[in-house]
């Protein structure tokens, strides 16, 4: 078993019309034993940028704390929030810096850039970025997430339809992966509001 599969995870981000959604499962396990059913994988960096971290839970929390620290330093120095592209480059640089003893995480970054244009990307544990215009996935359920997202995604969805699509994709995918699941956590972000919703799925 890969160390990336030790705790289990599923994270997905999807682009809509001037909005994006990012979702994750809520299970924290140690291989097949469930430890917690309300684990937070998605974090808000500021109102227009979110990050979801799949992988080893200890490294997820350590990396998140470092990212918050670096973003606050940037805010103090520049007196503004980071753009999503800048934040993605920061995450990539932090991961690459530790490439010989890497953080065992695979981040998914989603944000709204200039002119409310949505930006999503994912990267591997040493910071190699993968940009996309439709959706990105990571975690132990990524194979089934790819299939579900390919089947359900369509461009320029409004916020409510995007929520429905990402939720169905997440819930149907975690049912096919025994290391992730126990409901879902979804954020839908538009230029004017942030909606947070908890999904109830199969509780086994």
From Swiss-Prot:
Keyword Zinc in record: no
Keywords noted in UniProt: Cytoplasm, Nucleus, Proteasome
PROSITE patterns from the UniProt entry: PROTEASOME_BETA_1, PROTEASOME_BETA_2
Cited Pfam families: Proteasome
Keyword set includes Nucleus: yes
CDD domains: proteasome_beta_type_3
Domain of life: Eukaryota
Protein localization: Cytoplasm; Nucleus
GO cellular component, one term: proteasome complex
Predominant place of localization: cytoplasm
InterPro entries: Ntn_hydrolases_N (IPR029055), Proteasome_beta_3 (IPR033811), Proteasome_bsu_CS (IPR016050), Proteasome_sua/b (IPR001353), Proteasome_suB-type (IPR023333)
Gene Ontology biological process terms, A to Z: proteasome-mediated ubiquitin-dependent protein catabolic process
Subunit structure: Component of the 20S core complex of the 26S proteasome. The 26S proteasome is composed of a core protease (CP), known as the 20S proteasome, capped at one or both ends by the 19S regulatory particle (RP/PA700). The 20S proteasome core is composed of 28 subunits that are arranged in four stacked rings, resulting in a barrel-shaped structure. The two end rings are each formed by seven alpha subunits, and the two central rings are each formed by seven beta subunits. The catalytic chamber with the active sites is on the inside of the barrel.
Function: Non-catalytic component of the proteasome, a multicatalytic proteinase complex which is characterized by its ability to cleave peptides with Arg, Phe, Tyr, Leu, and Glu adjacent to the leaving group at neutral or slightly basic pH. The proteasome has an ATP-dependent proteolytic activity.
Family designation: Belongs to the peptidase T1B family.
Entry protein name: Proteasome subunit beta type-3-A
């Amino acid at each position: 078993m890969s160390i990336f599969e030790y705790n289990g995870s599923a994270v997905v981000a999807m682009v809509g019309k001037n909005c994006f959604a990012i979702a994750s499962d809520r299970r924290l396990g140690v291989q097949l034993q469930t430890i917690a059913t309300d684990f937070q994988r998605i974090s808000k960096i500021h109102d227009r940028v979110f990050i979801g971290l799949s992988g080893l839970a200890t490294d997820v929390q350590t990396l998140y704390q470092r990212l918050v620290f670096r973003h606050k330093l940037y805010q103090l120095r520049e007196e503004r929030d980071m753009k999503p592209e800048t934040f993605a480059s920061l995450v990539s640089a932090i991961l690459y810096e530790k490439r010989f003893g890497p953080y065992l995480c695979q981040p998914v970054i989603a944000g709204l850039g200039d002119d409310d244009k949505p930006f999503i990307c994912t990267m591997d544990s040493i910071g190699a970025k993968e940009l996309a215009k439709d959706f990105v996935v990571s975690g132990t359920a990524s194979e089934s997430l790819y299939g579900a997202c390919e089947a359900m995604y369509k461009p320029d969805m409004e916020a409510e339809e995007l929520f429905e699509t990402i939720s169905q994709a997440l819930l149907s995918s975690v049912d096919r992966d025994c290391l992730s699941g126990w409901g879902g956590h979804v954020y839908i972000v538009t230029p004017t509001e942030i909606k947070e919703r908890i999904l109830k799925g199969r509780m086994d």
